[in-house]
């Protein structure tokens, strides 16, 4: 058994979700017989890691500071193996602009988009280009922060009158925003496990919000707000295509260990589009990765054990090389 430093909480806007993920993971690690030191991440992180004398870190952080490569870079400096993707992959996944450009360049379909920084609006007059953007994307348009997760700051603009308010909301979460073509259809997710070279896709999950068309923060994390179907009721070809795109995105962004790929199945065309890749997906009681694993015959403890084993295997492989 290992001494595990469980990193949770932190100071991001997704702190509460991280605490919930961390609580679930801690219970599992203890059931598996590991010695767990739970660390609510803050300015004393390095001191607490050194005091813990851990063999491995289980990163259950979400949002800035934990999912954007910062903690991963620090753990690399300290020589402590950790779960999930490395700094570069985390940076690519966290910044949706970088991720979408990489996916598009690799031929992986993602909704058309334009991205601008706050400085572009303040210093370059980007607001004057909004009519041209709106004409190309057509309404409704999705406006969202470039970084972040859990659907925080995402707004739908049904008309030009809605765009300024949506931009203000998105800029309250980040200094860079994305304006994206809205894909109306079914909200799907494919979780992926394994090293970049030989990952495997888990059954597709479909999220069906009960009260709203949009799978927002409340729908994601409040029990009873969303119906989940896993495996999703899709034809074999669509399922295979969803798996193909998810694995392609996972490899293209350099993910390792585990990740979740969010997709939309467009109702009008039957086409699949990759929305984003989450380098550290939630592990709460309503999260999609545990549901997908369960549908594949992997209970939560086995899922946590595999994620931990992959972290140690990467360290062993690196040391051997």
Task: Write out the residue ranges for each language-model feature.
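A short glycine-rich, hydrophobically flanked beta-strand micro-motif that places a catalytic Asp/Glu
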Residues: 37-42, 181, 188, 256-268
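Phosphate-binding site of ATP-dependent enzymes
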Residues: 158-244, 272-273
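Hydrophobic beta-strand scaffold residues
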Residues: 36, 81-82, 110, 141, ...
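ATP-binding N-terminal substructure of ATP-dependent carboxylate-amine bond-forming enzymes
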Residues: 1-101, 105, 117-131, 306, ...
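ATP-dependent carboxylate activation and anion-phosphoryl transfer catalytic cores
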Residues: 2, 235-321
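Short beta-strand-to-turn element immediately C-terminal to the catalytic PLP-Schiff-base lysine
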Residues: 116, 154-159, 192-195, 266, ...
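Active-site nucleotide/adenylate-binding loops and adjacent lid/helix of ATP-dependent enzymes
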Residues: 1-8, 51, 92-186
